[in-house]
Amino acid sequence: MKLQGVRALVVGMRKSGVASAEFLARRGAVVSATDLKPLDELPGVGELGIPFAVQTPAVFEGYDLIVPSPDVPYDLPPLEEARRHGVRVIGEVELAAPFLKGRTIGITGSNGKTTTTSLTGHILREAGVPVQVGGNIGLPVTAMVESSRDDGWNVLELSSFQLETIHEFRAHIGLALNVTQNHLDRHHTFENYAAIKGRLFETQQAGDYAVLNAEDPVCVAYAARTRATVQWFSSRKKVDPGATLCGNKLVLFGKLLMEAGEIPIRGRHNIENVLAAAIAASRAGVEHAAIAAAVRSFRAVEHRLEFVRKLNGVDFYNDSKATSVDATLKALDAFPGGLWVILGGKDKGLDYAALREPLTEKARAALLIGAAAGKIAEQIAGAVPLVDAKTLDGAVRHAFAHAAPGDTVLLAPACASFDQFKSYEHRGETFKQIVNGLEPKD
């Protein structure tokens, strides 16, 4: 892709947008930037030394290339108008792809992406394989280009917001963990959301690998949409070729990998994450023994079923990354019962009724916070006692005051965080600060 002299506009100046602007400028593009926020509310943007304007429809005129950040809707009217006039509109992943050296593992799914991406990178790193991890976590892809190596691997977490803007980006190993309702406030329908996730496999070529969940009907359907060799994983049935859970044993391509009890992160969904990561690592050239050793040394990713503290016999777990109903269901499945579950935040257009049965079985109460509290209360009423806690601090303190030894306070909100927090990380950090500030009960 030739960028020298190209008139480029970057839309949305958070982390990804800043990285895209820097990347374009280094390659000789004539770069401008825009955002809904004014310049003084955008850290680091003023230091870029490029023209900036607060976003209006007129700002989008006169460019050869427009790069919207992942948080900018692809169907934004000025972007649609630009495409109608032949302007190339691509995301940061597509922008970086032609310049990225080495081979790429692309990991998507509604839940488990960050854990599986981190685990895959950890396995490769522990095995001595040159690797860097980024995308939707850590480094933006454009920031990975300079450090990429011809003999290395780039392990990328890819969200639907990123996949929405790819056209030619190719993952040598593509991986879909699951596809369940999420981001319907952005993508409008589940069918559209699922189709966007599937773009990861449509750009693959013969000789690539598509690693798919044999238990997920959407993932199964992706197999017909790719030219890659399909590899399956399942925690419930035997699959071939691929990885499966047989009793308590993880089997990879017909050979014992490890015992399920050796996996240091809790939950059946994390067994599936390990199976998927093991296939990817194996196809990247890592032997069984090295994969198993790396899995044993892996530690839970922050804000993903993260143990925080035990106080007066009560455990506290931070799963702030559980921003969808399905993610919360997986979190509930990881515990036997005695749960005080904190739910709520910014609604993403999801149906919370699926939480009713597991809450009835496992929860002492649901503590509701944030903008979605009313909707959640309506949809799970009668399933479990409800507490209108309003704030995270109120929820934690109420749960601890009423919890008995052996109980667990679980933050698994099933919602986005942006009503009360800057991000799910901010929400998780706040939860941990509150929990670590609790005094023992008399």
Curated annotation (Swiss-Prot):
Pathway: Cell wall biogenesis; peptidoglycan biosynthesis. It comes from the Bacteria. ATP binds at residues 109-115. It catalyses: UDP-N-acetyl-alpha-D-muramoyl-L-alanine + D-glutamate + ATP = UDP-N-acetyl-alpha-D-muramoyl-L-alanyl-D-glutamate + ADP + phosphate + H(+). Its EC number is 6.3.2.9. GO terms for cellular component: cytoplasm. Its main location: cytoplasm. It is found in: Cytoplasm. Keywords: ATP-binding, Cell cycle, Cell division, Cell shape, Cell wall biogenesis/degradation, Cytoplasm, Ligase, Nucleotide-binding, Peptidoglycan synthesis. InterPro entries: Mur-like_cat_sf (IPR036565), Mur_ligase_C (IPR004101), Mur_ligase_C_dom_sf (IPR036615), Mur_ligase_cen (IPR013221), MurD (IPR005762). One of its GO terms (molecular function) is UDP-N-acetylmuramoylalanine-D-glutamate ligase activity. The keyword Nucleotide-binding applies. GO terms for biological process: cell division; cell wall organization; peptidoglycan biosynthetic process; regulation of cell shape. Cell wall formation. Catalyzes the addition of glutamate to the nucleotide precursor UDP-N-acetylmuramoyl-L-alanine (UMA). Belongs to the MurCDEF family. NCBIfam families: murD. This is UDP-N-acetylmuramoylalanine--D-glutamate ligase. It comes from Solibacter usitatus (strain Ellin6076). The lineage of its organism: Bacteria, Pseudomonadati, Acidobacteriota, Terriglobia, Bryobacterales.
